[in-house]
UniProtKB/Swiss-Prot annotation:
Belongs to the glycosyltransferase group 1 family. Glycosyltransferase 4 subfamily. Pfam families: Glyco_transf_4, Glycos_transf_1. PANTHER family: SULFOQUINOVOSYL TRANSFERASE SQD2. Gene3D superfamilies: Glycogen Phosphorylase B. CDD domains: GT4_PimA-like. Keywords: Glycosyltransferase, Transferase. This is Uncharacterized glycosyltransferase MJ1178. It is an enzyme of class 2 (transferase). Its EC number is 2.4.-.-. InterPro entries: Glyco_trans_1, Glyco_trans_4-like_N, Glycosyltransferase_grp1.
């Protein structure tokens, strides 16, 4: 029985990434709530009966603004025709701005979830700060996926902000052994520090597998080929199930980010009993406890990162100990807890 209807401006399938996985884990566990998802491209293979996907036309060159305009028009019609109870936007721009516009036009409660780079990059950019401010100030509740993200908010917004951590899919995240390779999972963009990782591992006699895609991919691929770095394998974009398979087998996970709102990939690695080497930035400090469940390296420092990687390569017993501690630590993060927190927010705002 459907007890509530939610309009959800968000990234969703066919796009693979943290926000998509977050949204999927919400909708499949909140079966008594009907979700109308406004996304860039329709996903015809939707398997959830409580989910209706609405395709938002957009121009690739002006993706954000064109989505904002068209999602607002489509969202307004859905709210008026379907009797929507509240709006839950994922990411500040353009999705959060769509939710904010609809809230002001139709007087409907608006929840905004900040996932990381919107609070860390958009908020501080010349072009993005206006959109970030509009989305956050026109939200009744702001959900932050880490304490670090909440602390980035202006003081006048913190009273409406709460922290609800993401969960991990424990069904497919477990230890399958140590197959002697280091793993990176993330976008090939400057923020994720993949270029720092390449600099750190180019001379290390150990195998590394890098999963992801992005604007730095071609540059890194050319560097790997030109320098005959056969120990570095670029695997491109993979499905979450494929990523999980590599995580279960790796020796350790490397998260060399320049900025990170939370770093869910680190928790996923820990759920597989893998030690994590991460940079000392943002929300990663809430997850990776140096010497307990992983090792912390200094930001933008390939030499320090290299030292930490070599420390794990040369000490199998340390890998095992850190991995076991990480497994225990990862139990704090469950989708059940996350969904319970989101449901509570929905109930508070729909009363």
């Amino acid at each position: 029985m459907i007890i509530m209807k939610v309009l959800m401006p968000s990234i969703y399938y066919p796009y693979i990434g943290g926000i998509t996985l977050h949204v999927e884990n919400l909708v499949k566990r909140l079966k008594d709530i009907e979700f109308h998802i406004l996304t860039y491209d329709s996903y015809e293979e939707n398997e959830y009966k409580n989910v209706i996907i609405h395709n938002v036309p957009h121009l690739k060159k002006f993706r954000g603004i064109s989505y904002l305009i068209n999602a607002y028009k489509i969202g307004k019609n859905i709210i008026e025709s379907e009797g929507i109870d509240l709006i839950h936007s994922h990411y500040a721009f353009p999705q959060g701005c769509v939710g904010a516009l609809l809230k002001n036009k139709l007087s409907i409660p608006h929840i905004l979830t900040l996932h990381g780079s919107d609070a860390l990059i958009l908020k501080n950019s010349i072009k993005g700060r206006y959109f970030f401010k509009y989305a956050t100030t026109n939200s009744d509740k702001i959900i932050c996926v880490s304490k670090y993200i909440k602390n980035q908010l202006d003081e006048n917004l913190k009273n409406r902000a709460i922290v609800i951590y993401n969960g991990v899919n424990k069904e497919i995240l477990y230890n399958e052994g140590d197959y002697n390779f280091g793993l990176f999972v993330g976008a090939f963009v400057p923020q994720k520090g993949v270029d720092i990782l390449i600099d750190a591992i180019k001379d290390i006699d150990f195998n590394f597998k890098l999963i992801g895609d992005g604007k730095l991919y071609k540059k890194i691929e050319n560097f790997v080929v030109k320098n005959n770095l056969s120990h570095i394998e670029l695997l491109g974009r993979k499905s979450f199930d494929e990523v999980a398979s590599f995580m279960r087998k790796c020796s350790f996970l490397v998260v060399p980010s320049r900025s990170e709102g939370f770093g869910m990939v680190a928790v996923e690695g820990m759920a597989c009993s893998k030690p994590v080497i991460a940079t000392r930035v943002g929300g990663l400090g809430e997850i990776v406890i140096d010497g307990y469940n992983g090792l912390l390296a200094e930001k933008n420092n390939p030499n320090d990162l290299k030292e930490k990687i070599l420390e794990l390569i040369n000490n199998e017993e340390l890998r095992k100990t850190l991995g076991e501690n990480g497994k225990e630590f990862s139990k704090k993060f469950s989708w059940e807890k996350c969904v319970m927190g989101v449901r509570k927010v929905y109930e508070e705002l729909s009363d």
